[in-house]
């Protein structure tokens, strides 16, 4: 809440606002006025991530269309060069090429129960932070995490969960990974998913404009060679994307004849 935000700022905490952009809020969040309001309140950074329809109450109707994903990216790049507030994203390198932090090894996720998961929306684990070997060794030597990184990097520069939930299920079954949710329905939720586009949209890359983001991403948030030896079918993906964009574009109206 805004009141909670004010309390954090008054306490002198490094404070940011993370937003899950979806169909019902994209028009309000992708505005310079919203960022200016946060700056006026003293917020240090904002984080735009896009809604991913996963979990027990997934709502595909809220997910952004491919052209809206591009719109979010363009807005972030433009505002980074215009307004005095840090803007975080986790999906692109300095050239605007898509990447997945899990695939590149930048991050994994520790769930509430202590399970070391590939990423926040893959709620399965083999290892635990209570591993007597220590967290570092448990993550470094995990065949489960290694296979996930390699599978994801091999299949897409985007989100393997959104694009290929079937492969996620296969890998979970292969390793006998446990469901880390309290509800115990993560596998059924994977089965219920429909493949969709994620941040990998070949031909729609938007490079960073601001020198600071361009340099920092180039050296500290790159793909670290995860995709170096992978020949993705970017041309095929681009064709699929253009077909999708053409199918969803508003049709031109023929003017009435007198």
Where are these regions (language model features)?
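Solvent-exposed, non-transmembrane amphipathic alpha-helical segments
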Residues: 28, 35-37, 58, 63-68, ...
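Cysteine/selenocysteine-centered motifs that mediate thiol-based redox chemistry or coordinate metal-sulfur cofactors
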Residues: 141-220, 224-229
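C-terminal accessory region of radical SAM enzymes
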Residues: 67-95, 120-174
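Generic low-complexity, intrinsically disordered sequence content enriched
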Residues: 6-9, 143, 219, 245, ...
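Long, low-complexity, intrinsically disordered segments
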Residues: 223, 234-258
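Alpha-helix initiation/capping motif
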Residues: 22, 31, 65, 91, ...
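Radical SAM enzyme [4Fe-4S]-AdoMet core and its adjacent flexible, acidic
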Residues: 2-99, 103, 112-113, 117, ...
């Amino acid at each position: 809440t805004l009141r909670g935000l004010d309390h954090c700022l008054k306490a002198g905490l490094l404070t940011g606002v993370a937003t899950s952009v979806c169909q019902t809020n994209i028009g309000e969040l992708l505005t310079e006025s919203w960022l200016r309001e946060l700056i006026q309140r003293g917020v240090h950074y904002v984080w735009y991530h896009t809604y991913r329809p996963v979990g027990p109450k997934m709502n595909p109707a809220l997910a952004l269309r491919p052209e809206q994903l591009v719109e979010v990216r363009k807005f972030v790049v433009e505002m980074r060069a215009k307004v005095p507030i840090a803007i975080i994203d986790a999906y692109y390198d300095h050239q605007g090429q898509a990447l997945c932090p899990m695939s590149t090894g930048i991050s994994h996720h520790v769930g509430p129960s202590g399970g070391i998961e590939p990423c926040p929306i893959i709620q399965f684990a083999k290892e635990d932070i209570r591993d007597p070997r220590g967290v570092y060794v448990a993550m470094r030597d995990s065949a489960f995490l290694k296979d996930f990184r390699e599978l994801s990097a091999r299949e897409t520069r985007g989100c393997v969960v959104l694009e290929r939930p079937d492969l996620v299920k296969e890998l979970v079954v292969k390793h006998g990974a446990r469901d880390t949710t309290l509800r115990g329905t993560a596998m059924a939720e994977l089965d219920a998913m429909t493949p969709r586009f994620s941040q990998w949209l070949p031909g729609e890359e938007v490079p960073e404009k601001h020198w600071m983001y361009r340099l920092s991403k180039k050296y500290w948030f790159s793909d670290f060679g995860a995709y170096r030896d992978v020949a993705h079918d970017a041309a095929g993906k681009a064709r699929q994307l253009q077909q999708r964009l053409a199918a969803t574009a508003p049709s031109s109206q023929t003017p009435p004849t007198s």
